[in-house]
Amino acid sequence: MIPVDALLKAYREGFFPMADASDGQLYWCRPEMRALFPLESYRPSRDVLRLQRRGEYSVFFDSDFEAVIRACAAPRKDDPETWISGEIVETYIRIHELGLAHSVECRYRGELAGGLYGIAIGGAFFGESMFYRRSYASQVALWHLVCHLRLKGYLMLDAQIMNPHLRRLGAVEVPHDEYMRLLEAALRKKTAFL
């Protein structure tokens, strides 16, 4: 297990852990360009808003953290490799027990349909991973997270490494120096997640 103090210190310094998919070896990432969701201007797709209006999904916070992280760590049809090792899973479950890691669960007729998890420190939320089993479930979870973070006064939603999916969802990239300025401001803010 990753020592909790070391993990939290790493986040405060702009690092986050990943595991090599081939052997589970842990390494620390601090990309030169960082993906963020702009909390003040983020808008979900029309499809997500339509699903919201219809009440198709029920959304919860921290109702089943372990199920969410294990679903995120599971191999996917389009990508059988995962960067979420058993060591990462166990560490984040422990951090959740300490009240610092959180999940958003999206349920369809009571069944877990999608969700996401991450870590909250000060006014920053570090989104780690998301998954879905039904269309748009992870995007509904993301929209609820953004609304919740706005309500609580968070300043940052870190999506870490840009990819085409995050870009389609509305993430933007900022250079490392700008990211660190934003992070320092967010860490100074005292904000409860729940």
Swiss-Prot record:
<dbReference type="GO" id="GO:0030163">
    <property type="term" value="P:protein catabolic process"/>
</dbReference>
<protein>
    <recommendedName>
        <fullName>Leucyl/phenylalanyl-tRNA--protein transferase</fullName>
        <ecNumber>2.3.2.6</ecNumber>
    </recommendedName>
</protein>
<dbReference type="InterPro" id="IPR004616">
    <property type="entry name" value="Leu/Phe-tRNA_Trfase"/>
</dbReference>
<dbReference type="Pfam" id="PF03588">
    <property type="entry name" value="Leu_Phe_trans"/>
</dbReference>
<keyword id="KW-0012">Acyltransferase</keyword>
<comment type="similarity">
    <text>Belongs to the L/F-transferase family.</text>
</comment>
<dbReference type="GO" id="GO:0005737">
    <property type="term" value="C:cytoplasm"/>
</dbReference>
<keyword id="KW-0963">Cytoplasm</keyword>
<comment type="function">
    <text>Functions in the N-end rule pathway of protein degradation where it conjugates Leu, Phe and, less efficiently, Met from aminoacyl-tRNAs to the N-termini of proteins containing an N-terminal arginine or lysine.</text>
</comment>
<dbReference type="GO" id="GO:0008914">
    <property type="term" value="F:leucyl-tRNA--protein transferase activity"/>
</dbReference>
<dbReference type="InterPro" id="IPR042203">
    <property type="entry name" value="Leu/Phe-tRNA_Trfase_C"/>
</dbReference>
<keyword id="KW-0808">Transferase</keyword>
<dbReference type="InterPro" id="IPR016181">
    <property type="entry name" value="Acyl_CoA_acyltransferase"/>
</dbReference>
